[in-house]
Amino acid sequence: MEMQFPVILDGATGTELQKRGFTGDMSAEQWVLEHPESILEIQRKYVASGSNVLYAPTFGGNRQKLEERGIFNRTEEMNKALAQLSKQAADGKVWVAGDIAPTGRFLAPLGDASFEELVDIYTEQAAGLEQAGVDLYVIETMMTLTDARAAVLAIRSMSKKPILVSFTCDESGKILSGTDVVAALSVMEGMGVSAFGLNCSAGPEQMLLQLQRLHKYARVPLIAKPNAGMPEIVNGEAVYNCPPEEFVALVPEMLKAGVALFGGCCGTTEEHIAALKAALKDAEYVRPAPECLDLLPAATEKEAFFLPADATHGAVLTADGDLEDKLSDAMDDEWPMVALKLASWADVDALADYQYMIRKPLCLICDDTELLEAGLRAYQGRALYEGNLTEDALAPLVEKYGLLV
């Protein structure tokens, strides 16, 4: 599939379901299956108003979230059925995106999840969406880089369809786990996503500031799916007061910031989508022109680093012995990056356990493709490589993990 930019996404699902009787007493996914006419009405209105892409109502459809609601062993079945409802609403006129959202789980030291557990959770959900025949995938409202990476790997294990990724961040550009959105951009671009951006958390004005930051570094089209302003709590309920004409007032500035996909999150309606369609009439998308194409876009889990090709590291660390102390010392030395040798599976485990200490770009030293891939899979950033492996051996790892060589 080839999108002609700018593309109009859909608007809110959750707040629209609430208008139709959803109270939150059960899983939204279960409620939609019991009230299919609600999502069909919502999404048909979005199509009529100008949406080119519908998000399947599978936001909370991963196994973790379903089990928290007492729903077991139905992940694939429910995701397939929910996505088929969106296919019905689309009626072949627009694309349907399988919607994947946070698990709410964290890796150590913040939580007890393993990365492979997250991949497994998302793989089950993606399988149901793929069976339904979705046209693309959207990974949205991401609050940790680990969830986003796991979701991309899960999707790529069964599909080559386009993947859109959007995070939610605070006014400083940090997501819940402390990752800067520029670091998330670097990692996601390296993993081959088709577009990157922001959704939820803010209205258009606040979101624009972070999109302008991203524009300086983005090599892919950007996504803007803001709320209808910041909510006010009225009688215990969140009320969004940004009218359609105000919602689209900054569309010209967003286009200048490289935004190619526009939509609405919480509080937006078909009227906001219609306003977007009008605002984007005859608009021309200008692809981002990053300022740092000659630099290497490395990243830790938290921060982005743009390095010259001749950047160097100090002594190569080995994972045997006390890696914790070695990393602590390396973070305080004068070298711009840290190098770690992977010579065994125990080394990969050590990297996974102590990567939270890494605050510099990481260069992996390894001559075994299986070990190197395991290290790249475990490392929640974007690493550089040094070693004797051939370009042909490295090519799949560059494509899959964004390895910098």
Q: What label would you give each PLM region?
A:
Residues 1-405:
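Domain-level signal for soluble alpha/beta catalytic cores
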